[in-house]
């Protein structure tokens, strides 16, 4: 586990550090720092892409710093243009509120599962829905020139196709978040994905210009697979953390299907295993890649983190039933039968003891 002095070294080794502001290392080593990361509630659940900033916050908290997970109940009313080729439809206020509550609960469970202390959960709707337009333009807008905003990648990429004032002004709202958290919690570090660099640095500038405070930024890389595909996307779509949207079996299978060239990197990024444990798994995998021991451990660790150890064990058992056709059906327990019928498409059978595993495999695959 990293300390305040070794946090950046730990994040670098784990592949979680892409960009950072000058002087951040000394800032982290000198005192207890409060860091925050935003989570967008435009969907009813977090997805596995959100695990990267989540892991960043967990490592920050475990190193002895404080962390804030900020649900964007206010900014989601506007929509972030970063990485979008066209305007997003605006979700209703009721939908965003419901999503924010679900994501708040998910984040609470994740930080508890990671055994972290010093993590605060907040929602920017608490201040963004209360600030007046004139006050916002005077207190925030005056610190940013139009030229500065036009130079941001999220705006530049939309100049030709068009961008509404709503999305154009998004970075000011996110910058205001940083200022509010600086004033309320003494927050001096924002973390996020590298695609958020423009928005995050705007917040850093606002803290410095408006409050005269020290503020820093740290981003993680956007992840692609060794074959060049975007991480977290499957033919069925996103891989969600909510078991009603992506079953624990499907979640487990996503990780166990990791390419050989990616498994070591994912073990470092998405698990809390030590350097020695991961290096041992990599050595074992290099000797016998067909055994897929590293992939199995990756699937077990991440599924346990998201869904709990018991559910992860069942997901592993179901995976074994589905892919090991030599397995004797008589040895399969009732909980595994029940999970198969719940999680496997087409596995609708009259009773657990009447289940024909070979028929199941034919139906499902």
Regions found by a protein language model. Name each.
Residues 1-196, 200-204, 211-216, 229, ...:
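NTP-dependent nucleotidyl-transfer catalytic core
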Residues 210-365:
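Conserved nucleotide- and phosphate/pyrophosphate-binding catalytic cores
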